[in-house]
């Protein structure tokens, strides 16, 4: 549906912000390595034009302008091995009781997609710092989650799985940054508090269309912390695939152009490792998706004191 292949939003060297179609060197697929882009004019969700005007990229920004994002939906427990690694022995008993009706008999695999929301203010760019606000500095349970991100391109209501991909603008990679204590012990059964802080959903580095990603259900996905690989999987291992996810979420609830869907993370999160691995001030977190690229973000603890 889109005439661009790799949509980026960027600050150019002339000081202006543009949408553009990233220009990559031969053999390079990581949009984060783009240094130039052809400027895109018009409506990225409708009539637009990829011009011949080329601009130098100074900084890659969040792929969508704030006014273009309507809702940020997220799936939890959408890879079987991840669901198992965060099963009973790792979780607060109150959370287990709340989730009991949503899980299959083995207590690990959801019957239906597990949906939660993040505020639009949680979105950040592919190189922005991950701000750890004073309220989230209590405890040592700061975690990472690499995820394939779907960007909806046109309104989708009650769509079938067969037609679901027709409503996709493209795909990005994101990090569903999580504070497990606020998510599980303090969240009252709701996950948004522990996952929805400002800047806790960096994504990008651009939006890749189906011109490039022929099969979004077979892409390598990974996380590195300070250069060490801690997650390494493939999107084919999702419990609820991309077609199923879009169709399910559109039943009775219209998905709008600009809606963003984080589709869950594979195994290897800090909470599930032995010993557990929690993010610290100054850590560098890289999440990557095959044929899309990577986001590299530094964890930065705020120096302000919390009022709570």
Residue ranges and their predicted role:
Residues 2-5, 17, 50-62, 82-85, ...:
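Catalytic-pocket segment enriched in acidic/His residues
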Residues 15-17, 80-82, 99-101, 123-124, ...:
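Short, acidic Gly/Pro/Ser/Thr-rich loop/turn segments
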Residues 32, 45, 117-131:
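A glycine-rich (often HGG/GG-containing) alpha/beta subdomain
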Residues 116, 144, 149-155, 254:
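Short, conserved beta-strand element in jelly-roll/cupin
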Residues 149-175:
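RNA pseudouridine synthases
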């Amino acid at each position: 549906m889109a005439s661009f292949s790799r949509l980026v939003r960027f600050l150019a060297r002339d000081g202006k912000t543009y949408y553009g179609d990233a220009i990559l060197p031969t053999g390079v697929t990581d949009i984060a390595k783009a240094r130039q882009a052809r400027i895109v004019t018009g409506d990225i969700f409708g009539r637009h034009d990829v011009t011949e005007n080329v601009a130098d990229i100074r900084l890659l920004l969040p792929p969508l302008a704030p006014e273009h994002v309507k809702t940020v939906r997220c799936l939890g427990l959408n890879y079987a091995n991840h669901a198992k690694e965060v099963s009973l022995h790792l979780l607060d008993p109150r959370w287990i009781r709340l989730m009991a009706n949503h899980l299959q008999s083995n207590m690990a695999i959801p019957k239906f997609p597990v949906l939660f929301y993040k505020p639009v203010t949680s979105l950040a760019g592919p190189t922005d710092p991950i701000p750890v606000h004073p309220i989230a500095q209590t405890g040592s349970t700061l975690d990472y989650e690499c995820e394939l991100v779907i960007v909806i391109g046109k309104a989708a209501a009650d769509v079938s799985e067969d037609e679901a991909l027709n409503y996709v603008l493209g795909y990005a990679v994101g990090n569903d940054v999580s504070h497990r204590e606020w998510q599980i012990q303090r969240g009252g059964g709701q996950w948004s508090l522990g996952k929805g802080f400002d800047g806790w959903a960096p994504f990008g580095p651009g939006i890749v269309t189906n011109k490039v990603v022929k099969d979004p259900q077979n892409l390598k996905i990974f996380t590195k912390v300070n250069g060490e690989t801690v997650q390494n999987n493939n999107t084919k291992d999702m419990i609820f695939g991309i077609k199923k996810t879009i169709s399910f979420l559109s039943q009775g609830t219209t998905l709008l152009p600009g809606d963003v869907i984080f589709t869950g993370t594979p195994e290897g999160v800090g909470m599930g490792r032995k010993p557990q691995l929690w993010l610290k001030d100054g850590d560098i977190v890289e999440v990557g998706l095959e044929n899309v690229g990577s986001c590299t973000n530094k964890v930065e603890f705020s120096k302000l004191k919390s009022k709570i």
